[in-house]
């Protein structure tokens, strides 16, 4: 699926996963590096990061919160499974 056609929860998941991966590798977490991981331009990413902070999924230091990890777990367990089952991903 082209990245411009992604559903908002999928974009959120990609951002959260990107932040997590950057943290695991010890790389500096910047808007640019998150954008590269999540395949988002910086202007769209900034808007999405603000939304994720409002939702409590990312903190002000751009780190994934417990709620963010819960979101990722639910996404992979339910949403991703559903999309794959019906060939939508």
Please annotate each region the language model reported.
Residues 7, 25-26, 59:
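Helix-turn-helix/winged-helix DNA-binding modules
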Residues 16-24, 57:
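Short, locally clustered residues in the helix-turn-helix/winged-helix DNA-binding domain
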Residues 1-16:
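Short alpha-helical segments that sit at the start of domains
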Residues 24-37:
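Short acidic, hydrophobic short linear motifs in intrinsically disordered regions
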Residues 6, 38-54:
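Short amphipathic alpha-helical interaction segments
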Residues 53-63:
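A short, conserved structural fragment
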Residues 61-72:
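Accessory beta->alpha helical hairpin/"wing" motif in late/C-terminal subdomains of nucleic-acid enzymes
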Residues 70-89:
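Short, amphipathic alpha-helical interaction segments positioned at domain boundaries
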């Amino acid at each position: 699926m082209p990245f411009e056609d992604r559903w908002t929860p999928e974009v959120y998941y990609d951002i959260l996963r990107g932040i997590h991966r950057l943290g695991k590798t010890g790389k500096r977490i910047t808007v640019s590096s998150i954008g590269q991981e999540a395949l988002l331009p910086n202007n769209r990413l900034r808007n999405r990061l603000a939304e994720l902070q409002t939702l409590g999924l990312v903190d002000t230091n751009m780190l994934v919160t417990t709620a963010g990890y819960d979101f990722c777990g639910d996404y992979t367990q339910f949403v991703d499974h559903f999309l794959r089952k019906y060939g939508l991903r």
